Amino acid sequence: MSPYIMSTSDLILRVFVDSIPILPEFSTQIRRIEVESQVNLPSSCEIEFTDPDLTIPMECGLDIGNFAEVRAVTGDDAAGEAIFFGQVETLEIQFENSGGKLSVVRAYDASHRLLHGQKTMGYPMMSYSEVAEAVGAEHAIVTEAVPHPVVHEMVVQANETYWDFLVRLAKEIGYVVNVAINPLTGTPTLHFGPT
């Protein structure tokens, strides 16, 4: 078996930190990788290490603020396909009854930035797609918004997080919101468009 873990038949999940694969000595200590990705919700990733000394996350560069990526690798495709890209937000320690110590790294995709704080503001003479592009630009998130023909005199964000605001707009016109990795560029991209 490869030094990288989570092998299911021919599928292997590999962890990268700032685009560099973590060393085999650390990847063999990975006990669990869980990626949650849903439409209209930010994606998250948890990486759990068996870690008796509680040092692995720092030693392999998974410090708070660094970027973690999980790629699904199969057969001949050594680069694999990115299934998660996000920023490390928390490091946790867990203890098992058997005496084992675990380090848990939690990362969130770029859309989690849109959940920080509620705001009230207006967007004059814009379509919902243009509003999504403006919000993405304000938060330095590459945005792909499918144009919508209706231009509104004023679109109001009323004491909502940016994320809740975009989800509300999307639902009104039958669109969805998510952040996914663009396979052509490898960058996280905010999608605002039909299902």
Residue map of PLM features:
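Surface-exposed cap/loop segments at beta↔alpha junctions
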Residues: 55-146, 154-155
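Broad gene-expression machinery/nucleic-acid interaction feature
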Residues: 12, 44, 67-69, 83-85, ...
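Juxtamembrane "anchor/assembly" segments of surface/extracellular structural proteins
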Residues: 1-67, 103-112
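Short beta-strand-centered interaction patches in the first periplasmic/extracellular domains
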Residues: 2-3, 102-105, 109-111, 145-195
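Short amphipathic beta-strand and strand-loop transition segments with alternating hydrophobic
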Residues: 31-37, 89-96, 179
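Generic marker of residues within folded, mature protein domains
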Residues: 3-5, 37-39, 60-62, 76-78, ...
